[in-house]
Swiss-Prot record, chain A:
BP GO annotations: regulation of transcription by RNA polymerase II
Name this protein carries in UniProt: Mediator of RNA polymerase II transcription subunit 21
Organism annotation: Neurospora crassa (strain ATCC 24698 / 74-OR23-1A / CBS 708.71 / DSM 1257 / FGSC 987)
A single GO cellular-component term on record: mediator complex
Sequence segments annotated as region (Disordered): 37-56
Gene: srb-7
Organism classification: Eukaryota, Fungi, Dikarya, Ascomycota, Pezizomycotina
From Swiss-Prot, chain B:
Gene behind this protein: med-7
Cellular component terms (Gene Ontology): core mediator complex; mediator complex
Cellular localization per UniProt: Nucleus
Annotated protein name in UniProt: Mediator of RNA polymerase II transcription subunit 7
Family according to the record: Belongs to the Mediator complex subunit 7 family.
Skewed-composition ranges (Low complexity): 108-171, 302-312
Lineage of the species this protein comes from: Eukaryota, Fungi, Dikarya, Ascomycota, Pezizomycotina
Amino acid sequence: MSDRLSQLQEAVDQLMEQFIATYFYIDRHHDLKTFSPKDTIAPSKADQPPEVDTLPPDVFQAGQLELARDLITREQQIEYLISSLPGLDNSEQDQLQSIKELEEELNVAEKQRQEAVKEKDEVLVKLDQTLRSIRRY
Amino acid sequence: MADTEDDNSALASFFPDPPLFWKAFTPSNLQAYAEIKQQYASQHGIPVEDVVRVPDLPADSDLIYLQPPAEPKDGTWRLYGEPQSLEESLQPLESAGIERLGPPLPGSTTTSTSNTQTTTTDSQSTTQPTTDDTQPTSAFPSQQPTSQLPLPPSSTSAPGGASSGASSTQTHDTLHLHLKRLSKSLLLNFLELLGIMSLDPAAGSQKAADLRTLFLNFHHVLNEYRPHQAREQLIQLMQERLDQTRAETAANRAVAEKARRVLEGLGSVEIPAVDDVNIAGTGTGGGDGEAGYGSAAVPVPVPVGARTGTTVGDRRVGVDGEGAEEEEKMYWEREGMGWGVLDAEFA
């Protein structure tokens, strides 16, 4: 999983791809209209692929609806990602400050950890000795 | 003679020959170079492994081939015809010919002086018809101007270096709003594009260009935000590490404490017995005061032989705690009474 910033960038790229796909869908599957009653729609030639692949109105409507929904969903994802970007309230100085503090705390904690490990080892040795002497008995 | 032979073979062979300086890698040269490196390292007080390159080698010797070449002096070089720079920096939008929408991020010192100029170039470029097929390929045209106009390193390092060098106290709280505005504008512009295309397809290119500008701006803002995000992530990582370390310390202490309590409990019960055993040897000596019951027809308090001593030992290890001690005492009392009865009968 990548960080949120990369996720956001990918989401934006996907939004762009969806734009293109949506545009292509409408461009490809719309129906043809006449400007005046006298106009006629020329039948497409048999040896050429048709310019538009008109879908039945209800199918076309449904497709449009689905694509629009997808767009809105993607947009919502993007906005969610934007609002969850980390550390928008921190300035650079705040960040550097907290990094320094964390570093010191880490040093202290590491020392404490080593002490605890040493202590544990000592107790372990004692326990081991005791157990050994009992077993021998 | 040898040179001409080399040239001939280089022309004739299908694969190119290795570079000519491979002959410089003789054992004596390697030895000499290692010595120079060692000397250089000791002079500058750094470990030998950290010496990448010894400057000021005699230029006429073969030794210069034994180390990587120096960095380019002006910080730029070309790779596959593309100019590369030592300073990896984000190119400002304006210099890529893209109109900047909204305020620049805090920390980036990009000025908007060239704004009017870029807008004119932008509108000029939009006179070309832009179909949706060319859209994805033209979405990142920034490479084109860069390859034509390699910027001097001093000017490219300025915007990128400013954000890391001088730390700003401004926050990024306006970024939310800006990004949300941009994404909303994207949707709206796409809707407008569809509307325009349904009425007058020839006029759609302007809208497509707008969309392009919006997308580029979005990406640019995100890239400007990257250093900030990297620092943020570092903070998160350190916090996690800190928590982990503390948890480990606590767990270690808890275990040590528990073990010590067990030891103390054992010590109050067992340790005298352990000492007795250590003195008396491993159960073969019959002198221990507490072991003593079994087949020998002797009253209980009197010590008995070793055969029964081991069984007593086993039994004693099996139980522990104060309860065991009491049980032990009762056992001895019962046993003693039994032997007492026997003694009476015999007498």
